[in-house]
Design a protein with these regions (language model features):
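Ubiquitin-like/PB1-type beta-grasp interaction modules and other compact soluble beta-rich domains
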Residues: 1-83
Length: 83
């Protein structure tokens, strides 16, 4: 099945793109997708584990199952601001 993956900020830089369509096995989880992406794109290794994952705009756990057409966003930690 196919899912759409969105990357932001430094993770998009490491991925070399802001979005891509990825083919995953039926009953794949967010964690499975994360491992697949890190395996296929070595520059992502170690980065996606630090990101929150959102499926169809809802933040989810790595154990969340994916469905055909889901949109998965990897959201890197945010820092900065002023005091």
């Amino acid at each position: 099945m196919k899912v759409r993956v969105l990357f932001f900020a430094s993770v998009a830089d490491a991925a070399g793109t802001r979005s891509l369509d990825v083919e995953v096995e039926a009953r794949a989880t967010v964690g499975d997708l994360r491992r697949k992406l890190e395996s296929e794109r070595p520059r992502l290794a170690g980065k996606l584990g630090k990101c929150a994952a959102a499926v169809n705009t809802a933040v989810v756990a790595a154990t969340r199952s994916l469905a055909e057409g889901d949109e998965v966003a990897f959201l890197p930690p945010v820092s900065g601001g002023t005091r």
